[in-house]
Amino acid sequence: MRVIKGILISLACIVLISISSLYLTGNGFMINAIKRTYLAGNKTANINDHKAFDVATIKAGNKTPLPKHKNYNTTPLSADFLAELNKYNTAALLIIKDGQVLSEHYLNGYNERSKTNSFSMAKTITAMLLGIAIEEGHISGLNQPITDFLPEFKDDLLAQKATIGHLAKMNSGYEWDENYYSPLSPTVELLYGDDVADFLLQGHFSVEPGEFWEYSSASTQLMGIFISRALQKSGAAKSLSDYLSRKIWQPLEMNDDALWHVDGQSMELVFCCLNTNARNFAKLGLLMMNQGQWNGQQIVPADFVKKMISPTGSIDGTASSKGPQYYGLSTWLAHDRNPVFFWLSGHLGQYVINIPEHNMVIVRLGEFNNKSLDYRKPTTIPDYISKTYIKQALELIK
């Protein structure tokens, strides 16, 4: 008994020393990561982890469901496609045609009310809020210097040249390592840290703004901090969640409240982690498909939506050597595919796919994705989307 007691005391000491070491080395965020993810048996964040985070509520108002297409679920999905959905633990598959639900399927215990994590699809939603804030005059435009609302960078010579447009297009030059699986990566600290603003505002810019495109969750989070401060200064909103609720969620008559992860300071994690259901994600896709308009009301300025789905380049959204053809303002593009499409994309294969030529939106939510897909290899994801989801959707309307 004495031996067992000694072992337990030793283990407790090791745990305490380990925890103390994490805090002393500035890695206290790892405690949250261990509790919320690793002890749950996951190697990375998962689509149901809102249950382990503090959240802000995006309030819905009047609730109007999407109408069902006259051919709703009349044509079965192909056996190969169903196998693909099951292979990666798909939660929801929704196909919209002409604003109506054509095909709707829930798998692996999920249903039409299940709230799951958007991951980086939230980046595109945050960009919509930027467009609205510019239209309302809270932000002067995409050329506004970031130091106007991020004065912590006023002594950084490169940051002095950066604009809010650079953050939205991800060519700001902010130093960053986008890595979801390394426990000590800055991206993991951004997700699990207690104060994301303090963490990011201690960073620096290492490349001339506008000269180099690099996918970066930090850029979107800095954009969110910028928008939040602008809204608070003008008195337009007390938080980004409040602004999203009043400017998008309620006008679109979403069917349920949404949940947005927040840090210890109640700052929304705008680079990720907006939790809602498949039908609400579909409405966001339809909003973009309709140039920012919903039921005759202009929600997001049409010219801003056009910039969102135009290749990264000059500030007006035209293509240039300074940015890729496959990314716009916080939106992924496939202008070289037939049919052309653009999409919201999130970790583990969260997609809202928009196909303007066919007036279709496809939503796929799920627990895993094909491991061969990598945003750093820009052809892999659009190739997969074309050959898998779009192929199946087009078969339904033959």
Give the predicted meaning of each segment:
Residues 1-111, 139, 194, 384-398:
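N-terminal leader/targeting segments and the immediately adjacent pre-domain N-terminus
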Residues 99, 117-142, 167, 223-227, ...:
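Active-site SXXK
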Residues 107-111, 115, 368-370:
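A short acidic/small-residue loop/turn micro-motif
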Residues 136-175, 202-204, 232-272:
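Active-site helix/loop module of the DD-peptidase/beta-lactamase fold
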Residues 156, 208-216, 268-275, 344:
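Solvent-exposed loop and edge beta-strand segments that line ligand/cofactor-binding
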Residues 219-228, 270-293, 350-366:
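Active-site-proximal alpha-helical segments within enzyme catalytic domains
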Residues 243-310:
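Active-site-proximal binding-pocket segments
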Residues 254-258, 309-361:
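Active-site Gly/Thr loop motif
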